[in-house]
Amino acid sequence: MKTRTNSCLLGTIALLVVLISACGSAQKKPADSVNAGITFRNIAVPGTTLAAYRRCVTGPEHQKRVNNKKRLFITMNDFTDEPMHDRGIPGVVIFDYNNDGYQDIFVSNGPCRPSSLYENMMGTAGKLEFRDVAAQAGLALPGFNANGACAGDINNSGYESIYVLGRNGPNHLLLNEGNGHFKDITQASGAEAGVHSHISCTMGDFSGNGRLDIAIANSSDMKNAKAIMKNTADYNQPNQLLQNMGGNAPRFRDVSVSSGFATTTPLPGQTWAIAAVDLFQNGCTDIVAGTDQGAVPMTKYGGGGDRGFIRVYKNDCHGRFTDVTRQVGLMSSPGAWMGFAFGNFNFNGKISIFGTNFGDFLLPMYGLPQNLGDLSSRWILQRPNGTFADPRSSTFKYPAKSGADPSLGGLHATPFGWGVAALDYDNDGSTDIAYAGSMDGMNGADADNPGTLLRNNGPKKLIKGFYPSFSYDPALANDGADDRRRIITGVAAGDLDNDGHADLVTAAQGVMVGKLTEDHQHFGSPFDDSRYLAEYTSVGVMSYKPAPGNTTDGTLAVEMNKGGNGNNSAAVRTLGAVGLVPGAKANRDGVGAVVGFTPAGLPTQLDPVVAGSSYASQNSLVQTFGMGKSRTGTLEVLWPGGVRNKLFDVQAGERITFPEIPCSYTDKSMSVRDYTSCVRGSLDALVHKGKVSGSMAARFTSSALKAFNEAHQPG
């Protein structure tokens, strides 16, 4: 194990410290990469509407960095006074805003350029192309300094509305009117959420009333970097929870404190990531939040303290939350947690977490002793008892002493990350991971993440029967987007052309201009070719002079998965039936449901329906499940409220709308007669209201009865 020392630093205590070429580690043979036979192609190329996107800077705040760059020398205090994310935090939301069956793309922007809504024209044009309709749809938000966003059907109208977050200002709630237009109901709804640095948001029905509430991750005043650099939480802002009070144009009330979510004792954390997910699969939507360690030494190094955690707020099913982070074992994993994705990565039937982090290629920070593995982007695995196992167990001095997986699934080291998505990009039936990101701050920008695509090696390659193994696939690095130079924040996944392959959309706050320098760190990782852009060079203790490197406005990439291995897939969209069927509880999007898919002969995949995760972004709510060479599979949905439904004989290539049937096949209290009556009555109502076809209702009825009979067999 290697601990790199202070003499190896170009920079100093910061969000970003890059290493000079003289600082190196012993050469190791890098881990092998894999070619899964899948290709990606970036279609946001010159001449397209997508290529016109440019992320706008934050205005006067950005000018501080510009002015510093013109000076002969600057000091650490000058860096501290610079804004955080001075080029903003562009978020990506993939959603079908007009219900035409094709996924559209929303990308936030800054005060000098409008946000974009890229309408997918495939249904009318017959080919994949996009047009920016933000202005006519009412989503341009001119002059608004936007960060992340999330979307959901807040009034159960059948259309997804969108919530866009403000930087050091209030948020905007845009109600989808169902006619291609959004109405700004921010003030009338009470959803402004005050003047905070709102970063990420997520929607979920926390109180179990069939309405989507909104949880917001807040950071600190982004006009300067004091929250990171001054080693104090005094600058941090508490997170928020807005409860949906109902109505066609819903009103919201702040229940942040009364719900138990916005814990401020002793002080709030600096939160980057948030997600509403039924983590324990009990029918109740919990909240997972990621906070940042910042420039504070970890406890194991004898000072400072641990403050950056994956925090879990467990829901009592009525909207009251308890912070169970310690009880589930996550206080042993401090870090700079920045983005979340969820899946059954190790095939044990539990929902586990992948968290992006500072990575292994930017350490150590000046004066902060660090070991390989402390800040790895990595998976945190849920055990059968509801606690979590960290393969790196960073409270131990060395990962190997935890008895876990010191090789981190064979990758050894992982790069920096912001946005992340769990997806089965090669449709082999195993959940993979894609993430991206770069930190631009202080004396440079890191370029260690070329576009990370981690292929899950499957159930036969588990380590110690529990820890998954992953291989790096360079397919994203080779798609033409040049993600290594793009300072990516927003990442979202969805099938944009309905071809059965999950695509990726990434938004960058900036693009690096100038020579990238190799930092010569070698861990035996496929990411050992890490680089950085020097914007300043050290000329003494706490003194720096400008270097040639700089950044320019960020871009958008739409990275289309072209397949290539012949594997099959199926797609599913959940349809909650509250207000449509007596006894139904699930919101119209089915947000909070957990969908399981078991292809014939393969393990079960789990994909929770999450309206806002990653970093400042949101995946499509339409889920794509890989099937390998299987031709059939079984879908199972655990709905908010705890009802379970099944559909057998799902065929390869099918696109299923799965409605909530408010009668659980696992309910031991129901007779066959009562259960049959409930199923048929519910499906008849859904057919009558045009939500499912008669033929699909017959399939769901047959499957429901089969599932009930199987679950009630003696023994």
What annotation goes with each model-predicted range?
Residues 217-236, 290-307, 356-374, 436-448, ...:
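Short, conserved, GDST-rich strand-edge loop motifs in beta-rich repeat architectures
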Residues 388, 465, 469-482, 501-515, ...:
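Gly/Ser/Thr/Pro-enriched helix-cap/hinge segments flanking short amphipathic alpha-helices
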Residues 21-22:
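C-terminal motif of bacterial Sec signal peptides marking the signal peptidase cleavage site
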Residues 2-12:
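Bacterial N-terminal signal peptides that target proteins for export
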Residues 89-99, 119-120, 145-156, 175, ...:
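Beta-propeller blade termini
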Residues 28-86, 119-144, 175-196, 228-269, ...:
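Blade-edge motifs of beta-propeller repeat domains
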Residues 661-715:
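Soluble extracellular-acting proteins and domains
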Residues 99-109, 156-165, 208-217, 281-290, ...:
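Acidic/hydrophobic-patterned starts of short beta strands in beta-sheet-rich repeat architectures
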